[in-house]
């Protein structure tokens, strides 16, 4: 399985999936046949999470091939990412609290052997060990496997969900603050309070085609408890009527200018914003940073090929731009911070 960092390759992957595999998606999507056999799922999330292709584009193309009735499950899965972004955007303190808790837990668990065994793939669980290695090597995991992984981390290994979410963010090509953080909260039972997700031996065996044996899990754990509640915070954004001749900021989660509402406007300059590890609260692996770098450079080249004045700059350099700017706002997470 290979993720080539360009919009052209992303569109090719989307078209190939729709033409060849979408018809069987609803029936086969829960099966993880291993990293060498991913034809039953789209593997588009590393591109969607960076805006290289967006959710509307994916849905529109799928509906040109199949009716909504035949396509409903795929569309639902695509829209979960949109839902999570909207949910967290209206509750930004969930992200801020997560980072605060994470800082405390890092210090508490930096020498914890159970934690070190988990992130190094040295537990007694064959399936978990393989998934750790797969995550580090391919920077991707099947969605069903992510749920099993998180459940084992929280309820069998009894490790804090916050550290597990960080581990995913560090290594996943498609990691984003909303889907990742809220997904881990959901498994733990604090996103939908009292409702958690418990991995089970029979379920893992069934949906991995019996690739793993002797899966001894805690299948009777209770949900985690959080007394925190979050109120909605209304966000005010201005959509200026006249945006020509202004500078545009594009962050790493909205990289494809050609599919934005601004594609026909004439900007003075477009700045593609890159976020290095030294500016991030959660440090990413070198492979993930490299993937983001190549995606950003691909978009830069596309803009230049269309004679658009553009430049890649570090997020810390935004303050040096003195002319008027507008932005494809980053919604949530590291870029918004």
What annotation goes with each model-predicted range?
Residues 1-76, 80, 86, 90-106, ...:
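Trp/Phe/Arg-rich N-terminal binding region typifying the photolyase-homology
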Residues 48, 53-56, 61, 67-243:
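Active-site-proximal binding-pocket segments
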């Amino acid at each position: 399985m290979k993720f080539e960092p360009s919009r052209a390759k992303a569109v090719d992957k989307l078209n190939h999936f729709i033409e060849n595999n979408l018809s069987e998606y609803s029936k086969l999507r829960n099966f993880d046949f291993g990293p060498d056999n991913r034809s039953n799922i789209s593997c588009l999330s590393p591109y969607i999470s960076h805006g290289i292709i967006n959710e509307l584009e994916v849905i529109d193309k799928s509906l040109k091939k199949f009716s909504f009735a035949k396509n409903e499950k795929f569309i639902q899965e695509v829209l979960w990412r949109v839902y999570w972004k909207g949910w967290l955007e209206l509750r930004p303190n969930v992200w801020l609290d997560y980072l605060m808790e994470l800082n405390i837990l890092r210090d508490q668990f930096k020498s914890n052997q159970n934690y070190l065994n988990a992130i190094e793939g040295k537990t007694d669980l064959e399936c978990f060990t393989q998934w750790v290695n797969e995550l580090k090597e391919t920077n991707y995991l099947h969605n069903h496997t992510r749920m099993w992984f998180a459940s084992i981390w929280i309820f069998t290994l009894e490790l804090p969900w916050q550290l597990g979410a960080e581990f995913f963010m560090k290594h996943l090509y498609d990691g984003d603050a909303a889907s990742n953080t809220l997904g881990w909260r959901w498994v733990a039972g604090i996103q939908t309070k009292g409702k958690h997700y418990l991995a089970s031996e029979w379920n893992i065996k069934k949906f991995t085609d019996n690739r793993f044996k002797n899966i001894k899990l805690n299948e009777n754990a209770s949900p985690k408890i959080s007394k925190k509640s979050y109120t909605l915070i209304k966000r005010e954004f201005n959509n200026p009527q006249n945006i020509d001749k202004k500078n545009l900021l594009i962050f790493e989660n909205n990289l494809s200018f050609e599919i934005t509402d601004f594609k026909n406007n004439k900007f003075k300059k477009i700045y593609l914003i890159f976020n290095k590890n030294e500016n991030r609260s959660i440090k990413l692996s070198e492979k993930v940073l490299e993937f983001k770098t190549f995606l950003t450079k691909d978009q830069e080249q596309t803009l230049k090929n269309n004679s658009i004045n553009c430049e890649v700059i570090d997020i810390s350099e935004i303050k040096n731009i003195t002319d008027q700017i507008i932005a494809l706002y980053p919604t949530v997470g590291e870029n918004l911070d």
